[in-house]
Amino acid sequence: MTSRPADQDSVRSSASVPLYPAASPVPAEAYYSESEDEAANDFLVRMGRQQSVLRRRRRRTRCVGLVIACLVVALLSGGFGALLVWLLR
């Protein structure tokens, strides 16, 4: 396989820019180390529970948003209906 010669844009400079943003620090509740008393299975169970809690919270938030959106649509519909009745009287 032949490699093509590098042009000036592809030559690495001394000030390199990372391709990905720096990783945020791992939250303490998601950290696992073999030296801890917690077994790997217990860690996975705990992480699964946390993910379930987050999924339920997102689902609940989505349902509340949907109910609020339905109420807004119903109120606007009623308001426009009342305005139409008032204008056509």
Swiss-Prot record:
Matching InterPro entries: Herpes_US9
Subcellular localization: Virion membrane; Host Golgi apparatus membrane; Host smooth endoplasmic reticulum membrane; Host cell membrane
Residue intervals annotated with topology Intravirion: 1-66
Region Disordered, annotated ranges: 1-21
Regions of compositional bias (Basic and acidic residues) in chain numbering: 1-10
The entry's keywords: Host cell membrane, Host endoplasmic reticulum, Host Golgi apparatus, Host membrane, Membrane, Phosphoprotein, Signal-anchor, Transmembrane, Transmembrane helix, Viral envelope protein, Virion
TM region positions: 67-87
Topology within the bilayer: Single-pass type II membrane protein
Pfam families: Herpes_US9
Region (Acidic): 29-38
One GO location term (cellular component): host cell smooth endoplasmic reticulum membrane
Modified residues annotated as Phosphoserine in this record: 33, 35
Motif Internalization motif in this chain: 20-23
Function (record text): Essential for the anterograde spread of the infection throughout the host nervous system. Together with the gE/gI heterodimer, US9 is involved in the sorting and transport of viral structural components toward axon tips.
Family: Belongs to the alphaherpesvirinae envelope protein US9 family.
Name of this protein: Envelope protein US9
Organism: Human herpesvirus 2 (strain HG52)
